[in-house]
């Protein structure tokens, strides 16, 4: 198990001190008004200089940002774009300190650190946020969206408005906005998966998220919930036969070197990573600073969405070149076979009204 580094940031705010000039003895009787004026001006100048010297420190903000991405993943590049944009917009008064590759812990741990203000921000999926606001569970149910454009239309529009009612904030978090992560696909070491029946009996690793677990339990897989940081070891030691992740993660973590021979393009769920900040940190920013963070997040979002989509075919070709057997599947078959997962998600979410409201959003964005 990787040794995890707990990151806690203390921002130092220097107090402006006024420099005052004072004499040791009684003023001479011959002091003139001009001399007093000169002394007062010197004192005022000293005070002004002291305030100017300490002001930048008082305004300085550091954002410690944790995420899970490997060095070459789109999320890593997007995080760097966020950093450069924040620092550019703020004129250097705001800086971003990035810790990738789960250096600060897994998604659950990073969200917990963010919620208590130990770090300022993290990039986590809806499957992590649903522990704080259950409605996020609906976003990654199987086969909800016809494609990327519909997914973006839902999470950027009606869903964002719906969950912007303070529930997440009451748990110490604020979602600045969804970026992207992609549609998830299946890999395994045992056999080519062409149909839902081919999954039966395979030991499949998923995150500890009801949406993912239910998808593969509905296909008859032996689902093992294992942290991503332990995935490569589990695959190499054959603790599990396979796993499911977006193509960028499969490629950039070289899963063909971890006994993964077969790739099935199931595209069973879509999800994004969300720039999630500590709500207390967010409330402590000025309106202008929040604007910098929001604008930088939007820039990173747009970059990541473009990269995720444009690189899909490239990833598929590279995975094939690396020796993986790539299989297109009939997604309608998988959609039908995974239908029971909807019942599990609905039971977990707990509100038929929420489910109906969410599906109405999806239907409206399909028009």
What are these regions (language model features)?
Residues 1-10:
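Bacterial N-terminal signal peptides that target proteins for export
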Residues 18-21:
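C-terminal motif of bacterial Sec signal peptides marking the signal peptidase cleavage site
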Residues 23-29, 36, 49-150, 159, ...:
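N-terminal secretory/targeting leader peptides
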Residues 36-42:
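Short extracytoplasmic/periplasmic juxtamembrane "stem" segments immediately C-terminal to an N-terminal membrane anchor
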Residues 154-164:
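Signature of the catalytic double-stranded beta-helix
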